[in-house]
Swiss-Prot record:
Organism taxonomic ancestry: Bacteria, Bacillati, Actinomycetota, Actinomycetes, Mycobacteriales
Pfam family, one: RecX_HTH1
The organism of origin for this protein: Mycobacterium sp. (strain JLS)
The keyword Cytoplasm is annotated on this UniProt entry: yes
Name recorded for this polypeptide: Regulatory protein RecX
First-listed, main subcellular location of the protein, grouped into a coarse class: cytoplasm
Amino acid sequence: MTSFPHPSTSESGPDPDSEPNREEQAHAYCLRLLTARARTRAELSGKLTQRGYDEPVVARVLDRLVEVGLVDDEDFAEQWVRSRHLYAGKGKRALAAELRRKGVDDEVISSSLADIDAGAERDRAERLVRDRLRREKLDDEPGSDLKVKRRMAGMLARRGYSQSMALDVVTVELAGERERRRV
């Protein structure tokens, strides 16, 4: 029996830096990222670029993922808005800023935010303030209402609600909470 030398690692398979192989590596990396949570095309593009993948490889991989429906910025934006509005209590401005940071197109952002009407946004703000006011110590000292109003309006502003809505909601809810505590 004749013995052949062991093949060297360079002869054992395709070149790991070859274009098709790099594309498969990039595809596998994207799939790993997508198992954790949905991501936008821009987020995946940034991650691949960070890893040193060339632009043509990135474009082909992302086009493939979009084609099979694994990457859909419109669906991502709608789910993000629904989730962050409902569970985190974010207002339209904060949601728009978050989606912009994630690389979602402005048209997609405005269409996904159209699902939130002003009444629903106000209801969510009222609920947030009401819940927070129940835990708040309300003094009868002069000026204490101003401190509470500032704190509550600041909380709503950080969550992306407009200043006028925040002040209106806080004023109404604070009066309601004071009345509730008197009874």
